[in-house]
Regions:
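Conserved N-terminal catalytic core of the sugar/cofactor nucleotidyltransferase
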Residues: 34-105, 185-188
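Hydrophobic helical membrane-anchoring modules
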Residues: 216-235
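Conserved core of the sugar-phosphate nucleotidyltransferase
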Residues: 104, 117-210
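Short aromatic/basic micro-patch
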Residues: 26, 117, 172, 218-219
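Short beta-strand segments
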Residues: 5-9, 52, 111, 138-141, ...
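Short aromatic/hydrophobic "clamp" motif used to bind/position activated sugar donors
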Residues: 108
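N-terminal glycine-rich phosphate-binding loop and ensuing alpha1 helix
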Residues: 1-59
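Residue-level signal for inorganic ion chemistry
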Residues: 6, 33, 92, 112, ...
C-alpha cells in the first residue's frame, strides 16, 4: 500500500504574527496545512493521508478537515505526532499499522506540512522511484556556492557545487524498514540523525534522488509567508 505522511507537529509561533503554529496560518482562503493535504488528495494511489500533529492541536486539525475537506475526510487520519521529525514519522507509521497491519511493501510519502507548493508530479515521481529503491529524497541542484566552516569564523572548505543538492521533501520510505532502522539506533544516534533519508544512507541503503522544484518553498519565516502569498495570488 501507498500512504502519505504529513509532518505537522511543530508548535513554533516565531513569526510573531499569530498565536497559531505556522502550518495553521492562512494562505489565501485557507490554512497552509489544508493546501498541502489537498495536493495529496489528488493522487488516487494513496490509500490514506496521515497527518501527525502536536497533541494540543489534534482537535483543531480535525476541525479543519471537517471544514475544508469534508468530501475526503475518510481518506485522512489525524494522529498525535512525536517530539521531533523522526518520532513523528514513527507515530505516523504506527497509525498506518493500526489502520492496516504493515507489510514489507508498504511505503509512506512523508512531507513537510509547510511546503504547500508540492506538485503532483513530485508525488508521483517519489512513488515510482520507491518501487525499486529503499528510500527516495527530493532535491534541487544547489544554485549558490556552499562554503563549509568548522568554527563559524573561517572557511574550511568549498565543496564542488556540481555535486551538491538542496534537500526538500517529500521523502519516501518503506514503513517497516524505517521502523527497523530507527529502532536499531542508540539514543545518541537518534539525536544526531534527524533526517529519515540520512538514516537509510548511513545504514548502507539505496536512496534515490527525485527532482524537486525551486517553487517547493518551505514556509518558516515572515519573508517566506510573503513570498507564498504572492505565489498564491498569481495562481
Amino acid at each position: 500500500m501507498i500512504y502519505a505522511g504529513i509532518l505537522a507537529g511543530g508548535t513554533g509561533t516565531r513569526m510573531g504574527i499569530s498565536n497559531l503554529p505556522k502550518q495553521f496560518l492562512e494562505l489565501g482562503d485557507r490554512p497552509i496545512l489544508v493546501h498541502t493535504i489537498e495536493k495529496f488528495v489528488l493522487e488516487p494511489s494513496i490509500e490514506k493521508i496521515v497527518v501527525g500533529v502536536h497533541g494540543d492541536w489534534v482537535s483543531h486539525a480535525e476541525d479543519l478537515v471537517d471544514k475544508y475537506l469534508p468530501l475526503h475526510k475518510e481518506r485522512i487520519i489525524i494522529t498525535k505526532g512525536g517530539a521531533d521529525r523522526n518520532t513523528s514519522i514513527e507515530k505516523i507509521i504506527e497509525a498506518i499499522d493500526a489502520y492496516r497491519p504493515l507489510t514489507p511493501e508498504d511505503i509512506v510519502v512523508t512531507h513537510d506540512s509547510v511546503r504547500p507548493f508540492i506538485t503532483l508530479r513530485m508525488i508521483q515521481d517519489n512513488i515510482k522511484l520507491a518501487q525499486n529503491h529503499d528510500a527516495v529524497d527530493t532535491v534541487v541542484e544547489a544554485v549558490d556556492t556552499i562554503v563549509e566552516s568548522t568554527n563559524g569564523q573561517f572557511i574550511t572548505d568549498i565543496p564542488n557545487r556540481a555535486h551538491l543538492y538542496q534537500g526538500q521533501t517529500p521523502q519516501t520510505i518503506r514503513c517497516k524498514e524505517f521502523m527497523d532502522l530507527y529502532g536499531s539506533l542508540s539514543d545518541e544516534e537518534k539525536e544526531i540523525l534527524t533526517d529519515a533519508c540520512k538514516i537509510f544512507v548511513i545504514k548502507g541503503k539505496d536512496v534515490a534522488l527525485a527532482k524537486g522544484e525551486y517553487s517547493n518553498l518551505k514556509i518558516t519565516t515572515v519573508t517566506d509567508l510573503k513570498i507564498a502569498k504572492s505565489m498564491i495570488e498569481k495562481d
